[in-house]
Amino acid sequence: NRLAACFPETEVLPCGTALIRKARSVKTEIEIEMFRRSGIAHAKAYEQIPSVYRPGMTDRQLSIEIERLMRLEGCLGIFRTFGQSMEIFMGSLLAGDNATAPAPYDFALGGEGLDPSLPISVNGALLQPGQSFMVDMGGNFYGYMGDMSRVFSIGKLPEKAYVAHQVCLDIQEAVVEKAKPGAVCEDFYNLAIDIVTKAGFADNFMGATQKAKFIGHGIGLEINEMPVLAPRMKQELEPGMVFALEPKIVLLGIGPVGIENSWVVTAEGVEKLTLCKEEIVEL
């Protein structure tokens, strides 16, 4: 009301937040360039992860080292979200069965956390041979939230893990092939469910005990913007939209596998913003 009083000649419309979010879903060229620069710095940090791992580390110790890498590459250290009830630090590291713990927020995966007051990410457990872990850090380097997840393993994993990881890469490839202006957001979710069901991993997809009902989300000044790749989301992709695509599978006794990359919609399709190797990296 105070803002409206400053502009007496204007009409105040309801649902202003929704209108602003819709407008912000399409980025300007300057904003897109910020994402590109952020993606380069984000990848540089992730590429150094093998160099900071030491046998006998806990998930917390390794997470701290990765956060340090992110800050040294220029990450601002702030993880901005839409909605007052959602909070986290720079991101998460989920190892082994800790990835089966449900998320308290609208995240793909959760984690027990170090304390019940913040049940998210690392729980202080030792990283074990035969375990996978997923690094999912929000790359806020220039005020715009890039999003990228990569999977690492302590030694070799069971063959099932590599098969499941490839299924996630197949989902990414299928979605990217169809991601063009005019494509409907819910169709991408349905496509992912079809692929993962045929592959036999539907029970493990997007969570174990609690499943996320999306495979992607818009990113920008906040980590959870429009569009959302989820059921019943009829919004169409438009050039300039930027979103994270994150098909993930959790395997009991092994850990998480999958992929997350940030993409910008162009006139012809999509451009990948997070350029980093996508296979499981063995430590």
What positions do the PLM features span?
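Active-site neighborhoods and metal-handling regions in enzymes and metal-associated proteins
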Residues: 1-283
